[in-house]
Design a protein with these regions (language model features):
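Histidine/acidic-residue-rich, glycine-tolerant segments that coordinate divalent metal ions
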Residues: 1-101, 111
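Metal-dependent amide/peptide-bond hydrolase catalytic core
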Residues: 63-168
Length: 168
């Protein structure tokens, strides 16, 4: 989970070379598996509200910006390594269909086995958001929610941990 991020920020691992972790399961076991590096953020777009039928040309739809970003990121999927996972959900798309929404928000996750590769993919996602804002006449800001490196497993230490767990 993301709890270790707060421990790192507090300096609890400054003098630590190795961390043994164990996740609760239906049995006591230590597996030397890894995880995917993960980045997540909420992208917020702001535009100009107007009535969608009476005065649509005055509007600058924040929802259009979200949809443009989503479309560009969906096109990006073809051009990233196959191990990449990109997920999103529109968390705010306006309140009424007859009003051009002045605010919209989309929440993105991106995952990959390698943080350096994920960093490149993430910058492309952010660029898609910037391009969507530019193309729709809106503004964009984003808030990083989480960022987690992939776990680097140690087979030898996992074996020692497994032996200890078997004694429990």
């Amino acid at each position: 989970g993301g709890g270790k991020i707060y421990q790192v920020r507090a300096g609890l691992f400054n003098d630590v070379d190795v961390v043994l972790e164990w996740h609760p399961d239906d049995r006591n076991s230590a597996r030397p598996g890894t995880t995917l590096a993960n980045m997540s953020a909420k992208f917020r777009f702001r535009g100009v509200s107007s009535h969608a039928a009476a005065d649509p040309e005055r509007g600058r739809s924040a929802l259009d910006a979200v949809e443009a970003m989503d479309h560009m990121v969906n096109l990006l999927r073809e051009h990233v390594p196959s191990e990449t996972r990109i997920h999103y959900v529109i968390t705010n798309g306006g309140l009424a269909p007859n009003v051009v929404p002045a605010f919209a928000e989309v929440y993105y996750y991106a995952r990959h086995p390698s943080m350096p590769v994920l960093d490149d993919i993430w910058s492309r996602i952010v660029d898609a958001a910037k391009g969507a804002a530019l193309g729709t006449g809106t503004t964009m800001e984003f808030e990083i929610v989480n960022g987690v490196y992939n776990v680097l497993p140690n087979v030898y230490l996992s074996g020692l941990q497994q032996k200890s767990l078997e004694r429990v």
